[in-house]
C-alpha cells in the first residue's frame, strides 16, 4: 500500500539530533508545510532548524494526490456567507499566489509540474453550482461554468478554474530539501518555555513553528475542538485514458480523477476517521464499472485535518503563546495551503505583517456548527465503555477492517494492529492492556 510517489522517489536522508543546540526558529514537522517554511527562512537568512519524528514527507505529503489549485470544492459560496466578499476574495488571492509560487519554483525543479484546468463537478445539485459561480463572479475569480466530457458518468455541470497545476510532490521536495538544516527521527517530547526536549538533546529556540499535521499540544489553542480528521483513498490505474484536466466532486464523499503520466488516479471512499466508509472497496467497484480491464498499479490512503469553517489555521498558536506558531487544518488542499502557510509564517516569525495573516488566524471564532458535531462525537466516544482507548484524550477506538488499524473517531489518531502509533495527535503507542 505504497503511493506512487514513495515507490518512485527516494528522498535525501538526514541524521538524528544527538546534542543540545540553539536556534532562532525551530520548525517541528517535516511535511510540505514545514519544509517550505525551512526553505523560505533559509532564503531570508533566518537561523532555523527543522526536526521530524520519522522521515521527511512520511505523512500526508507522501500520500497526496498533489493537485495545486485555488478551487477547493464549492467553498467560495460558504466563504462569502461567513467572511463576506472581501474575506472570500483574500482567500482566493492567497491561494492563487501559492499556485504562482509553485509555478516559479518548479521552473528549476524537475518534478513533473504541469498546468491543468481544474473542474469541480456536481452530480445532482445544480442550485449549488449556481450559488458557487455567483460567489466567484462576486469576488472576481477566473472561473466559468462547464460541462465535463471526460467523466464516465453524467453530471449536473461543473465549474472550471483554468491554468491550475499538478506535480510530483516528492520530486519537488527533493529539489529544495537537500541543503536544509533538518534532523530526522527526532521527536519533540515536551517543552518548557523556549526549551524543547527530544530523545537525545534539547533545542532552545526563540520562536517555534508547529507543522505536525495535527498540532501537538492540547493545553493551548483548543485544537482538539477545532479540528477533526478524514480518511481518503486512491487507486492508480493502468488504463490508458488521458483526461483534459483534474476533476473532483463537490461532495465530500465523491470521486476525484487526474492523470500522472500513463496512470489514472481514482480517489474517493472518504469518511471521518473512525467511522465506516467506502474505502478501497468502493473505488475498486467504481473502476470495474467505468474502467473495465484496468489494472491497479498502486493503492494508498491519506488523512486530512478539517477545520471548523473550511479555512486553515495559520499563525500564532494561541493568544497566550506569542512566539509559538502553527499551520494546520488544510481541509484536503494541502499543497496550496502549505505554500501560503510558509509565506505567512516566514513573515510572522520575522515580526512582519502579512496581508493574509488576519484571515487565517487560529484565534478567529470557533462558534461554527461543526464545533457542536465535534463535541457530540467526542462525548459519545468518551462514554463508550469499550477498549482499546486512545491515549490522546481517552476516546474509544474503532476497528478499521479495510486497513487493519485502530482508529479514533474523536481526533483521528490511528494505531496498527500491534498498537504502534501511525497517525497523531496521540504521541505514543497503545498500552498492552486491551
Language-model regions: role of each:
Residues 1-25:
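Extreme N-terminal leader/targeting segments of oxidoreductases
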Residues 2-7, 74-80, 103-172:
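Flavin (FAD/FMN) cofactor-binding and adjacent substrate-gating region
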Residues 23-50:
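N-terminal Rossmann-like FAD-binding beta1-loop-alpha1 element of flavoenzymes
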Residues 43-63:
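Glycine-rich FAD pyrophosphate-binding loop
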Residues 135, 158-207, 211:
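Helical element adjacent to the flavin cofactor pocket in flavoenzyme catalytic cores
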Residues 191-193, 197-259:
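Flavin-dependent oxidoreductases
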Residues 251-252, 280-282, 293-371, 386:
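C-terminal catalytic lobe of FAD-dependent flavoproteins
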